[in-house]
Amino acid sequence: MKKIGFVGAGSMAEAMINGILQSGITKPEHIYITNRSNDERLIELKETYSVRPCRDKNEFFTHTDIIILAFKPKDAAESIDSIRPYIKDQLVISVLAGLTIETIQHYFGRKLAVIRVMPNTSAAIRKSATGFSVSTEASKNDIIAAKALLETIGDATLVEERHLDAVTAIAGSGPAYVYRYIEAMEKAAQKVGLDKETAKALILQTMAGATDMLLQSGKQPEKLRKEITSPGGTTEAGLRALQDSRFEEAIIHCIEETAKRSAEIKEQFAGAALERHS
């Protein structure tokens, strides 16, 4: 595996470092990390993972083949300005939400190979559903290397960049909607008489079991739903209540609004990049 440099050392960078090292595709000494000013964080990651903190930009970029942009999106202009002179022919992988490939290339001032990635927070346990898109400058080997790296934190799916707003809505923000559903289930369980701990255990196992049924059976969710819905039974009564409450419409509206907001943020960053370099 090529040597990897993380510019930014937050939670997503740590999740990726953890996944990469657990997978065994590279060694700790082949991972370099840097950030803007937080030395304590770099020391923490060094002590935890035995990776290499590096403040010397020339050394950092001379020794790395893949650069992962993992700082906060709002810091993109300043951060990319500070590293632009050191980027040669490395592959750039961006986990910066809202920044398109074109915007990133605009900040760098040239058409370099860029992989734009949308992971989710389950990367922390190597269960991320990650969508990624590639620039036309990325080679076949670049794509293979990026996919191998991303698969250390979960599943990785190559999509056209125009679909990344949808990926953001479904996968990027998706865990929050699952957690919100579980919150509602916990409240409902307590309302019908269960204590909080019992409710939580039952709900989490039900969610895990239902997901595994979908993955292992190969059946469509509609078929599995119908298999446990008896005419005049308890499940039918509950599903009717969901329908009366416009459950499906609420979910669709949620996803549409998330995708819409993702597109708006994308345009804001693009506009800021053009204004900065006009």
From Swiss-Prot:
Keyword Ligase attributed: no
Gene Ontology terms: cellular component: cytoplasm
UniProt catalytic activity: L-proline + NADP(+) = (S)-1-pyrroline-5-carboxylate + NADPH + 2 H(+); L-proline + NAD(+) = (S)-1-pyrroline-5-carboxylate + NADH + 2 H(+)
GO MF term set: pyrroline-5-carboxylate reductase activity
Native organism: Bacillus subtilis (strain 168)
EC number, UniProt record: 1.5.1.2
Signal peptide bounds: none
Cited function: Catalyzes the reduction of 1-pyrroline-5-carboxylate (PCA) to L-proline.
Primary site of residence: cytoplasm
Pathway noted in the entry: Amino-acid biosynthesis; L-proline biosynthesis; L-proline from L-glutamate 5-semialdehyde: step 1/1
Name listed for the protein in its UniProt record: Pyrroline-5-carboxylate reductase 2
Keywords: Amino-acid biosynthesis, Cytoplasm, NADP, Oxidoreductase, Proline biosynthesis
Leading EC class: oxidoreductase
Homology family: Belongs to the pyrroline-5-carboxylate reductase family.
Any Gene Ontology biological process: L-proline biosynthetic process
Subcellular location: Cytoplasm
Manganese recorded as keyword: no
Disruption phenotype: The proG proH proI triple mutant is auxotrophic for proline.
